[in-house]
């Protein structure tokens, strides 16, 4: 019987990793079960990035297992959470076990809205889903019900419990990035390595991409260089898909969209920019590196809505800035060809060379340009879809799961 297991909220803001709980759960499962009993890749699902309460990575994990009884999967998940989670502070681990995973509307709602715990419990009771724990069941349920049929990406996460974390050489990362792009992405930004987290967790690096073979090659070269025991797991993810933009809610703590003429632009604390578009205040953080929004005359922006003083404020994640410039020129003299000048009287122009006075209209020249506003690679949120991925949607589905998906 195929049974889906979801886990969330097992880490704190400074320790632990929910993906490591899944890694150890699968390694334990494989001690007594064949690999064929694990249905495709485990899944790493990022949730609504705008909710005020979320785990450090704001992600839940899930996997499909072929077991004789769903209680077997539940017991395995409970063991892994007890052994590898950090239940301190605001951590509220949750486990979900379901024999179906096709209630995709739950996934889309978890990406775009705020789901109360009592609503999730009501849905699970109605669907016959087994659950244990606290607030983490919301993300766990969303991960189980994730819809990755149209687009998904992969991430290989390598683990080590040794401290300190090994140093990853920037030159090697750049070389591997150049040889695997565009089938891997978000590896490096200038001289800054993006693949290594700096928190107190067992993840030593994560390689994202659309081809399992390219990310395995990338990881193998790094493992050889940093000289640690190879331990990794490849996840199927919704990262870099832009799934959170599929539903625009325009209410607090949801993804929002604003379009209109720019009425005011001003610098606020920290060098950030506040733009008034119609009646909405749009905020752009300086470190995002948006290029031209301070010059925009018309702006299309998307991001997260948060309550403002009198209305909703949009915190910009990306968009399009349009710059319109109106250039007014005096025409040339129809008699001698010199540039006409103003006479100081409305509507009249005078030629400084031949003295002709004329009522010829001034020439209006319109110029326009637009820029696609994307954050710097080092500031990209997990769900943000980079332009480099356009045209690669669904490519993951072309490849079979390689034998080295877990080691």
Curated annotation (Swiss-Prot):
InterPro entries: TiaS-like_TCKD (IPR053870), TiaS_FLD (IPR013696), tRNA_Ile2__agm2C_synt (IPR024913). GO terms for biological process: tRNA wobble cytosine modification. It catalyses: cytidine(34) in tRNA(Ile2) + agmatine + ATP + H2O = 2-agmatinylcytidine(34) in tRNA(Ile2) + AMP + 2 phosphate + 2 H(+). One of its GO terms (cellular component) is cytoplasm. Its EC number is 6.3.4.22. Its main location: cytoplasm. GO terms for molecular function: ATP binding; ligase activity, forming carbon-nitrogen bonds. Keywords: ATP-binding, Cytoplasm, Ligase, Nucleotide-binding, tRNA processing. It is an enzyme of class 6 (ligase). It is found in: Cytoplasm. ATP-dependent agmatine transferase that catalyzes the formation of 2-agmatinylcytidine (agm2C) at the wobble position (C34) of tRNA(Ile2), converting the codon specificity from AUG to AUA. Belongs to the TiaS family. This is tRNA(Ile2) 2-agmatinylcytidine synthetase TiaS. It comes from Caldivirga maquilingensis (strain ATCC 700844 / DSM 13496 / JCM 10307 / IC-167). The lineage of its organism: Archaea, Thermoproteota, Thermoprotei, Thermoproteales, Thermoproteaceae.
């Amino acid at each position: 019987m195929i049974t889906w297991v979801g886990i969330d909220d097992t880490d704190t803001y400074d320790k632990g990793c929910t993906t490591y709980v899944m890694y150890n759960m699968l390694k334990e499962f494989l001690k007594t079960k064949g690999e064929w009993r694990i249905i495709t890749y485990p899944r790493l699902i990022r949730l609504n990035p705008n909710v005020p309460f979320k785990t450090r990575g704001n992600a839940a994990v899930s996997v499909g297992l072929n077991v004789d009884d769903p209680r077997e999967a539940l017991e395995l998940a409970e063991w892994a959470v007890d052994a590898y989670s950090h239940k301190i502070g605001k951590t509220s681990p949750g486990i979900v076990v379901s024999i179906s995973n096709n209630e995709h509307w739950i996934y889309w709602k978890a990406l775009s809205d705020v789901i109360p715990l009592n609503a999730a419990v009501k849905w699970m009771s109605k669907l016959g889903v087994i659950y244990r724990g606290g607030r983490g069941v919301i993300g766990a349920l969303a991960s189980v019900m994730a819809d990755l049929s149209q687009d998904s990406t992969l991430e290989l996460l390598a683990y080590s419990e040794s401290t300190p974390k090994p140093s990853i050489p920037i030159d090697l990362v750049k070389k591997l990035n150049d040889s695997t792009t565009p089938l891997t992405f978000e590896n490096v930004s200038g001289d800054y390595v993006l693949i290594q987290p700096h928190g107190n967790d067992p993840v030593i690096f994560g390689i994202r991409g659309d081809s399992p073979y390219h990310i395995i090659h990338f990881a193998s070269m790094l493992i050889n260089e940093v000289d640690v025991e190879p331990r990794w797991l490849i996840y199927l993810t919704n990262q870099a898909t832009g799934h959170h933009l599929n539903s625009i809610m325009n209410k607090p703590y949801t993804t929002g969209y604003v379009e209109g003429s720019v009425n005011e632009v001003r610098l606020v604390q920290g060098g950030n920019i506040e733009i008034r578009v119609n009646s909405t205040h749009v905020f752009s953080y300086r470190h995002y590196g948006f290029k031209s929004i301070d010059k925009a005359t018309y702006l299309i922006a998307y991001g997260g809505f948060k309550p403002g003083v009198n209305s909703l404020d949009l915190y910009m994640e990306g968009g399009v800035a349009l710059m319109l410039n109106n250039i007014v020129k005096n025409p040339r003299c129809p008699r001698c060809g010199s540039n006409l000048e103003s006479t100081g009287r409305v509507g009249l122009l005078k030629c400084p060379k031949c003295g002709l006075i004329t009522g010829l209209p001034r020439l209006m020249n319109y110029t326009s340009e637009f820029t696609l506003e994307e954050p710097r690679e080092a500031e990209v949120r997990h769900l943000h879809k980079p332009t480099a991925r356009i045209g690669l949607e669904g490519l993951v589905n072309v490849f079979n799961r390689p034998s080295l998906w877990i080691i």
